[in-house]
């Protein structure tokens, strides 16, 4: 399977991009904001046969860091995606958005409806306040009930931060999103 990585310069920021597969493109939008696309690879790369999956680390996340003074709101994220679409030479996008990426896909479709061919939402972030409050309460409950606190405590005492900072960072991130994938 073909895998390519590059950095795209759009709207004054450098965005890391990874492409997997060959065929018609599907843009995969990761959660966050402020996260990276890597955690989606084990699940989403199985969709690559017959298409090109385009992942990119959104402004301010992963391998696309920005200085503090650079805005990273939803409008900037939407316009970054529009600038990438133009740079890629695509008339319309097929988008698969996970969590915050699903909400970003919805916002993009609202702002640029003529530029979206297909939009798949995977466990997208809540759109209205009441749903967000309910989600946050359930998420906090899963965080406590699933033994994640004990796992975090073990990690803090493991010495991994000093011996392998990158592995420590990855594990901290895994534990920060683990309650999203809790088995009810």
Locate each region found by the language model.
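Catalytic nucleophile-loop/oxyanion-hole region of alpha/beta-hydrolase
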Residues: 65-78, 125
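Conserved HGGG/HGGXW glycine-rich cap/lid loop of the alpha/beta-hydrolase fold
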Residues: 7-70, 84-86
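Short, hydrophobic/aromatic-rich segments at coil-to-beta transitions
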Residues: 1-6
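Flexible "cap/lid" loop of the alpha/beta hydrolase fold
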Residues: 118-161
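Alpha/beta-hydrolase
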Residues: 146, 150-184
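Conserved hydrolase catalytic core segment
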Residues: 91-135
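Short, glycine/charged-enriched secondary-structure capping and boundary segments
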Residues: 41-44, 68-71, 109-110, 133-137
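Conserved acidic catalytic loop of the alpha/beta-hydrolase fold
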Residues: 75-93
């Amino acid at each position: 399977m073909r895998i390519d990585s590059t950095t795209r310069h759009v709207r004054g920021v450098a965005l890391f991009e990874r492409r997997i597969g060959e065929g018609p493109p599907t843009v995969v939008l990761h959660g966050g904001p402020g996260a990276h696309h890597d955690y989606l690879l084990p699940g989403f790369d199985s969709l690559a046969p017959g298409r090109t999956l385009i992942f990119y680390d959104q402004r301010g996340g992963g391998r696309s860091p920005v200085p503090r003074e650079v805005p990273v709101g939803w409008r900037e994220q939407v316009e970054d995606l529009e600038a990438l679409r133009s740079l890629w030479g695509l008339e319309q996008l097929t988008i698969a958005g996970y969590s915050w990426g699903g909400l970003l896909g919805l916002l993009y479709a609202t702002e640029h409806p003529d530029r979206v061919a297909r939009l798949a939402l995977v466990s997208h972030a809540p759109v209205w306040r009441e749903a967000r409050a309910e989600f946050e309460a359930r998420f906090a409950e899963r965080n406590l009930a699933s033994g994640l606190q004990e796992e975090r405590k073990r990690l803090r005492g493991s010495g991994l931060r000093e011996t392998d900072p990158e592995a420590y960072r990855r594990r901290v991130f895994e534990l920060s999103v683990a309650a999203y994938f809790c088995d009810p």
